[in-house]
Amino acid sequence: MRNTLRLAAVFCAVVLIVTGISIKLRRMSSATTAKENRLVVHEWGTFTSIAGKDGVALDWRPLNGVTDLPKFVHTMQDGRGLRHIPNKGDLRAQVRMETPVLYFYSNQEMNISVEVKFPKGKITEWYPQARSLSAGINWGNLKITPGAAFNLPADYSDNHYYAARETDAAPVQVCGTSGKPTEQEKFLFYRGVGSFDLPLSVKLDKDRLTLQNRGSDQIGRVIIFENRDGKTGYRVIDNFSGEIVSERPKLDQNVDTTIRDLRQALVSSGLYEKEADAMIKTWRNSWFEEGLRVFYILPRAITDQTLPLQITPQPAELVRVLVGRTEVITPEMKDAVKKEVSKLNDPSPAVREEARLEIQKLGRFYEPVLKLILEDEKDSVVRARIQRILDSPAIHGE
C-alpha cells in the first residue's frame, strides 16, 4: 500500500513537472514567435509651404520646375501611373508634401497591407506601384522581405532619391497585378500637394520674425535658418507654444552645426540614426541653400490627422516624423527679382533672356516671390510684366 501511494506521489510530481515544462516551453515559443513577428514601421517626410505677408501660407504651383526624381518613379502625369492630367506642374496648392518614406523592420518575411489617406490633397508621385489613388494611396498587399537581395531600380543618375535607401530597413515587394510588373524598394515612397492648415505661422517684418503656434500641441523644436550670400546662421526654439518674436539669425555659424541640431531633433522624435542621416542627406542641398526658412517637427497628432495611415497587421511600433519647412521671402530676394523684372522689356533679346533665366533660378519659388512683389508694386508697366510671367504655363511638369 505504501509503495502504491509512493508511486502515485512520484507520478503526480512527474506530471506536474512535465506540465510546468510544457507551459514554460509554450510561453517561450509564443514569446519567440511574437518577437520574430514584431513589425516596426518608421516614416519621415516634409511639408513645404511659403509664408505670405500675413503669415498665412501662399497658394503656389509646387511642381512648377524640373522634376528631381528618377524616371522609374510613377507620377500622375505618366502613362504608367493610375491617373493622368495634362501638366501636373499647373497644380496649385498651399503645401508640397515631399518624400514621405515608410520603412519596415521585421525579423522574418511578412505579408502586410498599407494605405495612406490624404483627404485634403492628392498624390502626385509614388513608388512602388500602387493599387489605387483614391483620396490618398493604397498599395494593397505587400511582402516585407528582410535580407532579400533584390536588384533595386536605378536610372544611373546622381539623384537625391537614392539616399533614402541607406538604412537597415527590410526590402518591400509589391506583387504585380493586372499586367503590372513586380516592383521592390527599401521603402514605400509617395509625394503630393494639398491645401490645409499647418500649425506654425511665420511673418517677416524687416529683420524681425513673428512665429505663432496656432495648434493646440507644443512644437518640439523650431529652427530658424538663413543662408545669405554663402554666410549662414540659425536659432533654435524648443517646446514652442503661443507666439514669439525673433531677430533674423546672425550669420556666424556653419551649416554642419545646424545639421547637428536638426539631426538631434529627428532622432529625439523617434527616427533611427541612419534614418535621420538619410533624411538630411536627401534634402541637404535644398534645405540649406540661399534663403530664409523655418524648420519644425510637426506634432504627431497633426501628422495622423493630415495623413491617416492604416497598416495591417498593426505594427508593434509606429514612428512618424514630418518636418514642416516654411520658406520666408526676404526683402533682399524681392529686390533681386524686381531688378530682373525691369529688364524684361529691354530692347536686347539677350538681356531679356538673361533676366528670365535669373528669375527662374528660384525654381518653383519664383512665382510666389513675384506675387508678393505684385502686391506692393505701383508701376503699371512693371505690374503688367509680372502678370505676364504669372499667367504663363508651368516651366516643366516633368
PLM segments and residue spans:
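Hydrophobic membrane-insertion alpha-helices, especially the h-region
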Residues: 8-20
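Protease-labile, long low-complexity intrinsically disordered regions enriched in Pro/Ser/Thr
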Residues: 27-343, 350, 361, 365-375, ...
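Juxtamembrane cytosolic interface motif at the C-terminal end of transmembrane helices
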Residues: 20-26
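Conserved hydrophobic register position within alpha-solenoid helical repeats
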Residues: 355-356, 386
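Positively charged n-region of N-terminal signal peptides that target proteins for export
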Residues: 1-6
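Helix-centric, low-specificity signal for extended rod-like, repetitive segments
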Residues: 17-20, 345, 376-378
